[in-house]
Amino acid sequence: MPKTETYPRLLADIGGTNARFGLEVAPRQIECIEVLRCEDFESLSDAVRFYLSKCKESLKLHPIYGSFAVATPIMGDFVQMTNNHWTFSIETTRQCLTLKKLLVINDFVAQAYAISAMQENDLAQIGGIKCEINAPKAILGPGTGLGVSTLIQNSDGSLKVLPGEGGHVSFAPFDDLEILVWQYARSKFNHVSAERFLSGSGLVLIYEALSKRKGLEKVAKLSKAELTPQIISERALNGDYPICRLTLDTFCSMLGTLAADVALTLGARGGVYLCGGIIPRFIDYFKTSPFRARFETKGRMGAFLASIPVHVVMKKTPGLDGAGIALENYLLHDKI
């Protein structure tokens, strides 16, 4: 089928909290972008139908090709979201939406593909020197959960994305303060993963743990209604609540440790890329936060890590971009 006959293509980036939808009407041209809350819809199909009804006026043709990036492992036809209530069959959903092809990929596979096509102004560099062109790239990002993937270049120049669930590795405390935070989390959960702290809910968990630290009993604290990631971040930056600043500093330090662990494991001299909606909200603070110092605090491997650049993805819709690139690869090569 000629490529022009595959447009518009239905794209989705589905996380734990929000589902983003868009229509790719031409290569890398995405229109009618909408963000829907997952909790407002009983199923993915309901959300898609609602989205398409909103875009009815701009739709000249019904999409017959779709690509959905979802924040959960893909292990066959049945998909169960990790951080929301949606479950679905890929084939049943394809039929329900009358699509010729529905590609469903992990959200951080989509993020990796998006990074392969990004321009310099889509990224904010945090330390390091230059990326090695053919070296592995590590992609991770705190959001509702914590995603991790790897982008490598094959010998023929093509790209390969390795999906993973690195957000669920066991968290390793770095110092006494992080041991305290870990102990608090361990009292609540059987397994304390990196995602427990490096996510939106993780900010709240760190705050709760620190609020019980000896010596902080009498400092100004947030009310229960104010215990949200957004408010903790805002209070941290305006300086009114030292405990919120300590929370954000601890979050960034922990992220530095994990990013370094991933970079060392992969030999990611192609760079580390931080995705997700959390860090861009406080990018100016993040540039001077404890993140980079902690990233390089790896003993004998400090010099190795000091050369690796870390980039914060500032682009608004990388998940949709990556879903579109993955679908393009599939249509051209019958693989992603």
From Swiss-Prot:
InterPro entries: ATPase_NBD, Bacterial_glucokinase, Glucokinase. It is found in: Cytoplasm. One of its GO terms (cellular component) is cytosol. GO terms for molecular function: ATP binding; D-glucose binding; glucokinase activity. Keywords: ATP-binding, Cytoplasm, Glycolysis, Kinase, Nucleotide-binding, Transferase. It holds the Pfam family Glucokinase. It comes from the Bacteria. It is an enzyme of class 2 (transferase). ATP binds at residues 12-17. Its EC number is 2.7.1.2. The keyword Methyltransferase does not apply. Belongs to the bacterial glucokinase family. This is Glucokinase. The lineage of its organism: Bacteria, Pseudomonadati, Campylobacterota, Epsilonproteobacteria, Campylobacterales. The gene is glk.
